[in-house]
Amino acid sequence: MRERFRRARVARLATVGEDGKPHLVPVCFELAGDRVVSVVDAKPKRTGELRRLANIRAHPSVTLLVDEYDDDWTRLWWVRADGLARVVETGADRDDAVAALTAKYPQYEAQPPGGPVVEVTVHGWVGWAYLEG
């Protein structure tokens, strides 16, 4: 299950705002043990004040979902990671996360991410695959 999660190229990060409304965004990520990291990178954003960061600061419980769809339904699967997130602005934890993300996504070599890191400590894994029942 974790290996499928780790190999995925994009996850959906679900957070909850102070108003109780869910917020879902696609993110690049890396998995290291029970920690999932993502970074606010240089891709264009509508605003510098990202809702996901405000939501995490207000309510740190998050979910990350990766999945595979195929018209051959025997290839379908999904993995969900539930955990507690924190926003890491500076320091060794941020630097280590960016290095791990750069190893997975070479695009970051040309455009080094300058934003904060979202670090999720996973406390629950759930998944399903057609061939595994």
Each model region followed by its residue ranges:
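Short beta-strand segments
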Residues: 8-45, 64-67, 77
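Short secondary-structure boundary/capping segments
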Residues: 2-3, 28, 54, 70, ...
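Active-site-adjacent structural patch at catalytic or cofactor/ligand-binding sites
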Residues: 58-67, 79-84
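Charged, gly/pro-rich active-site loop segments
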Residues: 47, 72-133
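A short, structured loop/turn motif at beta-sheet edges
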Residues: 32, 56-58, 88-92
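Generic structural signal for secondary-structure transition and capping sites
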Residues: 9-10, 61, 106, 125
